[in-house]
Structures are given as structure tokens and as C-alpha cells.
């Protein structure tokens, strides 16, 4: 039987913006899950992932424009710890498959900035810490990890800003990228 766990990570920052706003807005993300408790895993956020959000450090326009296009910068580490798979059984889960999806334009490794009134020329990237591989958000990049019933499995990543290209200067504004992590396991 194949089971799927979906975890959403949002990387967001009030980047480059010191504007006074007369409008009050709020964003609410509602997530839920229905699972068979006897045949499921516990996925716990780690690192700087707090309530599905990684808050990046503010970067100035000059700092962002000085970066090479396609380079991850001003990073924050985060991850997921997967434990207690198939509770009450003799460790039938031996591996996990992780896939990440998100909105991209021309470069499948850069999440589009989806913030309203957002900065231009900049996006969000995610890199696996285990092998420094930049994650592709088009579903083509699948990572397989072993699973230990005694210690669980740590899925470790870093995320940060990415200058989209050298021809487009970075402008001020908020930055937001949303990545959906799907963790599959077999029972």
C-alpha cells in the first residue's frame, strides 16, 4: 500500500521594502490531513521551518544585484524529520521518496515570486544539504531516502533568494515562494 504525506513550505520575506502601507491584509493558509493512524508516518518540521514558513533575512537591492544569477544566497536551513512509520508493525517501511512542486517560469529550480506587489528579478531556491543538489519544482526531481524505524529519517534542506538572471535588475518588494513537499512511503 502506498501512502503519501504532503508538507507545504513557504519561504517569505518583507524584502527590500520599507514602504508605508495604508492597507491591512492578512493571509491564512489552512492545511489538513486525514490519515490511517496505524499506517502513517509522523512528519515534524525542523530548523527554521515554523508553521510551514521559513522567514528569510532581508536583503538590500544592492546586495541582491551584486549576486550572480542563479546563485542561492541569504539562506536558512530547514527540514523534516520522518518518524513512527507504520506504528505497531515490524518496520515494513524501508524507504521514502520525496518530490517537490512549485510555480516556476523559465528555470525549474527557481520558485517564482508570488508575493502581491513583489520584488522583481528575484525568486526562491531550495537545495538539499545531503548532496548540495538544487531542487527542481516541476516534479522531475525525485529524492529517495532510506528509513530507520529506530531513529527515523532527517530530510535537510536550505532555502534562500536567487537572482533570476543578470539582465533583470532586482527591485524592492516582498518575496514569497511556495513549495509543496510530497513524501511517499510503501507499507
Regions found by a protein language model. Give the residues of each.
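Mature extracellular/passenger domains of Gram-negative fimbrial/pilin and adhesin proteins
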Residues: 20-187
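Gram-negative bacterial Sec-dependent N-terminal signal peptides
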Residues: 1-22
Amino acid at each position: 500500500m502506498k501512502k503519501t504525506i504532503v508538507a507545504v513550505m513557504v519561504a517569505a520575506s518583507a524584502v527590500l521594502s520599507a514602504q508605508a502601507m495604508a492597507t491591512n491584509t492578512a493571509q491564512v493558509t489552512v492545511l489538513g490531513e486525514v490519515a490511517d493512524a496505524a499506517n502513517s508516518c509522523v512528519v515534524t518540521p525542523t530548523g527554521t521551518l515554523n508553521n510551514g514558513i521559513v522567514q528569510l533575512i532581508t536583503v538590500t537591492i544592492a546586495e541582491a544585484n551584486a549576486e550572480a544569477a542563479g546563485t542561492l544566497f541569504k539562506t536558512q536551513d530547514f527540514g523534516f524529520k520522518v518518524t513512527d512509520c507504520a506504528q505497531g508493525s515490524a518496520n515494513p517501511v524501508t524507504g521514502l521518496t520525496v518530490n517537490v512542486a512549485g510555480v516556476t517560469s523559465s528555470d525549474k529550480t527557481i520558485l517564482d515570486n508570488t508575493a502581491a506587489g513583489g520584488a522583481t528579478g528575484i525568486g526562491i531556491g531550495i537545495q538539499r544539504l545531503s548532496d548540495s543538489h538544487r531542487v527542481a519544482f516541476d516534479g522531475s526531481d525525485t529524492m529517495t531516502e532510506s528509513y530507520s524505524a529506530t531513529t527515523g529519517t532527517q530530510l535537510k534542506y536550505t532555502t534562500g533568494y536567487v537572482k533570476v538572471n543578470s539582465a533583470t535588475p532586482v527591485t524592492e518588494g516582498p518575496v514569497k515562494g511556495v513549495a509543496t513537499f510530497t513524501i511517499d512511503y510503501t507499507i
